[in-house]
Amino acid sequence: MGPTACVLVLALAILRATGQGQIPLGGDLAPQMLRELQETNAALQDVRELLRQQVKEITFLKNTVMECDACGMQPARTPGLSVRPVPLCAPGSCFPGVVCSETATGARCGPCPPGYTGNGSHCTDVNECNAHPCFPRVRCINTSPGFHCEACPPGFSGPTHEGVGLTFAKSNKQVCTDINECETGQHNCVPNSVCVNTRGSFQCGPCQPGFVGDQTSGCQRRGQHFCPDGSPSPCHEKANCVLERDGSRSCVCAVGWAGNGLLCGRDTDLDGFPDEKLRCSERQCRKDNCVTVPNSGQEDVDRDGIGDACDPDADGDGVPNEQDNCPLVRNPDQRNSDSDKWGDACDNCRSKKNDDQKDTDLDGRGDACDDDIDGDRIRNVADNCPRVPNFDQSDSDGDGVGDACDNCPQKDNPDQRDVDHDFVGDACDSDQDQDGDGHQDSRDNCPTVPNSAQQDSDHDGKGDACDDDDDNDGVPDSRDNCRLVPNPGQEDNDRDGVGDACQGDFDADKVIDKIDVCPENAEVTLTDFRAFQTVVLDPEGDAQIDPNWVVLNQGMEIVQTMNSDPGLAVGYTAFNGVDFEGTFHVNTATDDDYAGFIFGYQDSSSFYVVMWKQMEQTYWQANPFRAVAEPGIQLKAVKSSTGPGEQLRNALWHTGDTASQVRLLWKDPRNVGWKDKTSYRWFLQHRPQVGYIRVRFYEGPELVADSNVVLDTAMRGGRLGVFCFSQENIIWANLRYRCNDTIPEDYESHRLQRV
């Protein structure tokens, strides 16, 4: 069939479909057939035009397809027509740095760059720090992409370390090599002593063979002893020669020995008294009346030659101490009228229960039954400071609390609420302390200069730390030969550079410099913890009970008797630089928990603590988080965002850092716990002006732990005290503190090593 026939058939089909192909029967067929043919011809013309247009479009599409390639559409060659190519790899199709390829099925993104994971179009950073690529105790910092490790910790050396990708992080760990300080000379052991290298640090041991002494006094050839100025030492071979402020020399027995310095004998319990009597007349030459239990006051109530600390019947009344309701007062009848813990013979309120036996004014009548607790001759019911003597009863803010005991004397706050135990009421506590010395700016006599002691010798309102004329005598401190004592004439008869007005007693406090623990502060003369603040660090709940503190030896010995919640006994004296030493002894074999001491105390959320655990143990209260204590000595900086409570309690128990609570500054690498009924002597040096901290522990004459230099400035000074946590029968004996702002020689070498 030819093209014309096909077109005719197609036209007839269309006519039938439209009803135009029907020819009625009968009638005149010629005119009608002519008319039908004309209509058919017109329809064919329409079909022909339609087909011509379709052929043209098909030709155009054919040409377009033929000129298509993999890189996009080429311009059409049909005259008068053009096509703009559409790119498949448009900007942003793939992640930056990822190769985009166009395929027959569309754009395809390559793999994500190293350090990222994803499908190429969407890539996320990989945290390589999860692979622990850094050396232990070195912080890993994740970047995008990659990671880098901070510098090797003190005591180690190594190159910087960084990389990209998990594969690299897993197979390439940071390498830090231990520095042998004993070989490099970076140690601070005294000459002629043994230096023992440890991982990341070192320890100073005893004197080498042929030498005698220790790390405090130095090691000298046997038979040769010298004072720090090079002169021959007059001291016993177990004593240190000390140069006093006035240039004189004194002798102090070394740790583990006791006596007058010219003669020294073994001191097993480190309480300052020799095991056997020495041939000297001083008190410290007497035989210790408790050889194995520290009792620096040598108390002996029944005078039987056995000290109360180790006498099973201290008062000699035939009733053992454990059963005696007056263990230090004879009372064989054990009469107890008010049925409290104390027998009538020693009860300061016989007819009223008062287990604490508190007696504020020391008049022999307990506070519980004393109608004038503070002894200011104003009865308690009318006294606006019933526990603080204030004869004038002044009350500036009219809140019913006298100025003498008001923690916000200029602001009405009758409830006296003080949640952080810093003696500043919450109503006026701003917590703004720009110099970090523990005194808020509005109460700081040197708000921009750290001076925790707040010493103000001339009482002019400006602290000595920022006053260029401390004694207000008109002579600037830089030229004043008695900086703390007014002497405008600057008399100095012996021309030794020290004015006559302060010769031998620099602060004019009537205590000679040789025995004055703070010769440049008239407010502090002797070590004394008889007045102290108790701070309970877990005040809520019933996990345990609060500590029970007993002070002996005129404030130089503290005993804690109960298995208690964490607690502090804090002295009221604040220090700038200080040396703090004491003997620590657990006088029981029934427990294995924490005991220690604190320094830099500013409030119940801010202080340093040195704490010693005997055995590893998980704290029995798992809320708010699991806390695990490891054995050994730990130095921690407490900066708690919550203050006393469960969070701080568990953070103190836990060995390690706890976010927003506690930072572990140092831990004894030996992981050795304290021994039952064994005495240890500690020595602390704290110089808050530069952040210098160093603590050492001795067992007998042997140095057993040394933190070496630790630098931290979280607390720029503060108060001292002792610490316990769930441990009973702790003795802190022979306590001594001394103001000292002199920077130790090992500070600079350690600082340079860190840099």
From Swiss-Prot:
Required cofactor(s): Ca(2+)
Keyword set, alphabetical order: Apoptosis, Calcium, Cell adhesion, Disulfide bond, EGF-like domain, Extracellular matrix, Glycoprotein, Heparin-binding, Phosphoprotein, Repeat, Secreted, Signal
Domain EGF-like: 85-124, 125-177, 178-220, 223-265
Changes after translation: Proteolytically cleaved by metalloproteases ADAMTS4 and ADAMTS1 with ADAMTS4 showing more potent activity.
Residue span of region COMP N-terminal: 21-84
Record GO biological process: apoptotic process; artery morphogenesis; blood coagulation; BMP signaling pathway; bone growth; bone mineralization; bone morphogenesis; cartilage development
TSP type-3 repeat residue numbers: 266-298, 299-334, 335-357, 358-393, 394-416, 417-454, 455-490, 491-526
Signal peptide segment: 1-19
Tissue expr: Expressed in cartilage, including nasal, knee epiphyseal and rib tissues. Abundantly expressed in chondrocyte and tendon extracellular matrix (at protein level).
Classification via SMART domains: EGF, EGF_CA
Superkingdom of the source species: Eukaryota
Domain TSP C-terminal: 530-744
Alphabetized InterPro entries for the sequence: ConA-like_dom_sf, EGF-like_Ca-bd_dom, EGF-like_dom, EGF_Ca-bd_CS, Growth_fac_rcpt_cys_sf, NOTCH1_EGF-like, Thrombospondin_3-like_rpt, Thrombospondin_3_rpt
Segments of this protein annotated with the region Disordered: 296-341, 353-501
Function: Plays a role in the structural integrity of cartilage via its interaction with other extracellular matrix proteins such as the collagens and fibronectin. Can mediate the interaction of chondrocytes with the cartilage extracellular matrix through interaction with cell surface integrin receptors. Could play a role in the pathogenesis of osteoarthritis. Potent suppressor of apoptosis in both primary chondrocytes and transformed cells. Suppresses apoptosis by blocking the activation of caspase-3 and by inducing the IAP family of survival proteins (BIRC3, BIRC2, BIRC5 and XIAP).
Family: Belongs to the thrombospondin family.
Domain notes for this protein: The cell attachment motif mediates the attachment to chondrocytes. It mediates the induction of both the IAP family of survival proteins and the antiapoptotic response.
The protein's name: Cartilage oligomeric matrix protein
Species name: Mus musculus (Mouse)
Gene coding for it: Comp
